[in-house]
UniProtKB/Swiss-Prot annotation:
GO terms for biological process: translation. Belongs to the bacterial ribosomal protein bL32 family. It comes from the Bacteria. InterPro entries: Ribosomal_bL32 (IPR002677), Ribosomal_bL32_bact (IPR044957), Ribosomal_zn-bd (IPR011332). It holds the Pfam family Ribosomal_L32p. It comes from Aster yellows witches'-broom phytoplasma (strain AYWB). This is Large ribosomal subunit protein bL32. PANTHER family: 50S RIBOSOMAL PROTEIN L32, LARGE RIBOSOMAL SUBUNIT PROTEIN BL32. One of its GO terms (cellular component) is large ribosomal subunit.
Length: 68
């Protein structure tokens, strides 16, 4: 089994780790609501994707109980 000849120093270890970082999410502006959303996903509030209605908005539970 191979054994390191020398111990890796703090500086070398930290320089190697500087490249592990989070990237900013790709946000796009929704044409219908003017809100930022993740790209390639349907907006939760309006249900639109690429300018087309994909999901119909369902009434919430509170609205269903008050309609009866």
């Amino acid at each position: 089994m191979a054994v390191p000849f020398r111990r890796t120093g703090k500086t070398a270890k930290r320089k190697r780790r500087t490249h592990y970082k989070l990237s900013n999410p790709a946000l796009v502006l929704c044409k219908e609501t003017n809100a930022f959303t993740l790209s390639h996903r349907v907006t939760k509030n309006s249900g639109y994707y690429k300018g087309k209605l994909i999901l119909e908005n369902k009434p919430s539970k509170a609205q269903k109980t008050t309609d009866n």
